[in-house]
Amino acid sequence: MERSLRKKRIGRVVSDKMEKTIVVAVETKVRHPLYGKTVNRTTKFKVHDENNEAKINDRVSIMETRPLSKDKRWRLVEIVEKAK
């Protein structure tokens, strides 16, 4: 039950240069409070990748987890789409 309360996101891998860690950029659409235009916001997350299986430009699903280091609070769930 508790696992379903964790946040899930889908994003693209922008860096895989670290050992067991990838950087995932997640895009969200937000309406501008004054002008009403839809703006794309990008947030980068450091994600734990135990087997180093995700590569750059892969589309991945990530899930919130306990703090694993100073910046890492997400873990890789699955690779949705491999890079071409």
UniProtKB/Swiss-Prot annotation:
Database matches in Pfam families: Ribosomal_S17 (PF00366)
UniProt KW keywords: Ribonucleoprotein, Ribosomal protein, RNA-binding, rRNA-binding
GO cellular component: cytosolic small ribosomal subunit
Record text on subunit structure and interactions: Part of the 30S ribosomal subunit.
PANTHER family per record: 40S RIBOSOMAL PROTEIN S11 FAMILY MEMBER (PTHR10744), SMALL RIBOSOMAL SUBUNIT PROTEIN US17M (PTHR10744:SF1)
HAMAP family given in the database record: Ribosomal_uS17_B
Stated name of the protein: Small ribosomal subunit protein uS17
Native species: Clostridium beijerinckii (strain ATCC 51743 / NCIMB 8052) (Clostridium acetobutylicum)
